[in-house]
Amino acid sequence: MTKFTINSENVKRLQTLSGQSKDLISLTKPIFCPSDGNLSVNLYSNRVTMSFSVDISAFETTDTGELNYFSMSIDEFNNTLATVSNGENDVLVEVDKDNNKVTFKNNTTGTKVSRAVYNAIVTLDEAKASVTAVDDMRDEYLKDPVTLKVTNEVSEFFETASKIMGLLKTQDAISLNGTSARYADQLVVINKTLSTSVSNTEVHLKRQLYEAIKPFLKITSELTVYLTPDFSIAFFESKDLGFKSILSLEKPKFAYPEDSDLEGALPQESSQVIVKTTKSALKDAFIPFNNTFKASPESWNWKKTDLDSSANNLAEGKWVLRYENYTGSAESVVPVTVVQNTEGANNGKLIVSIMVLEELLNIIPEDDLTITYNSLPSDTMYGALMKLDSDTVKACVTKYKP
C-alpha cells in the first residue's frame, strides 16, 4: 500500500492546474508519481506532454518502489479532489496495487472516495521515463533555442496580436487585376518590446502559439517559451508553478528563411519602399470605409484592401487606400512622403486588412510613423515588412505582384 498526504494549499493548486489543463489542448491522461516528497503530474495528448510537481506533506510506502505509480483521468482526479476536500483540508491518498484502486480521504472529516486506477498501475521505469521526457526532448531539440518571455504585463498585447493573426488567415479567393489568386496563409505577427524578448520567431508565431500561451497566463506570473530553430516544437516552462509542456507546431505554409530574423527576413538586395506618414492621416482615411460599410459588418468577412503604392501615386505623395467587398467600394487618399523607392515603376500593391491597420494604429504611441516594405521575389507573392517608427511594433504582411 502506498500512502501520501497532499496539504490543502497544494490541493487548491492541483485543482486549478487540472482544471486549466483542459483549456490548454485536450490533455486527457495524467500519471501521478509520488516520489521523494513530490507529486509529479504528467498530461498527454497527441501533441502535448505537460508535467508539474507539487510538494506533499507526508509520504509513506510499504512497496519496494516499482509500483508507486498510478494513472487516472484528469477529470476524475479533479472531481475527486473537489468532492473530498474543496481545497479546505489535507487529503490522504492511498494506492492499493492489489485491488487496482486509489482512495482519497479527507484527513479532517474522514470522507472517503475510491476510484479504480485508470489504465492500470505502471512500473517505476515507465513513470521515470515519462517524467524526464520533457527535459530530454528539450535537451535534444533546443541546441540554440529561440526564447520568448511572457508575463501578465503583455497578456493584453497578445490579445491584440491574436486578433490580427486571426484576421489574416484565410483561404478565400480574391481578384487581383482580373486574375484569381488565393491566400496561401497570410501571416501577421507583432513584436511589442515590453518584457518580451523575441529573436527570429515573428513570422512563425501564429495563432496556435498564442492560443497555447493564453491559458498559461491565467495561472502563472511569468512563462518562458523555448522554440526549436525550425519552429516545429515549442517548450513552455513556468518556474513559479513548476510545470513544463511541449507543443508541436504546424509549419507555416508561407514563411521567410528560417535562419533570418524579422529585420533580415527579406534579402538586402530586394526592392524596398520607405514611406512616412502620420497616424492621424491614416486614421482619417478610414472614415469613408466606416461610413460606407457600417450597416453591414458581416461583409467584413470578405475584405480586400489595397494600399496602392504604385509609382504614380508615390510620385504624387499619396497612397490610395481602397476597400472592396460584395456591398460596394470606397477610396481614401493617405498623404505620404516617399523616403526611398527602389522598386521603380513596376512596384505592386500592398494588400493589408483595414482592421489590421486599425489594430496597429491602436497600439503605437507616436503620431509620426514610417512604414517600410521590402519585396521577396516569387511567382505570385511578395513578402512585405511594415516597421513603425517607434520600433516597438513590427508586422509582416503579404504583398502581391500587380
Where are the regions that the model predicts?
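DNA polymerase processivity clamps
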Residues: M1-A120, R138-P252, G264-P402
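Flexible hinge/switch segments at interdomain interfaces of large molecular machines
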Residues: K253-D259
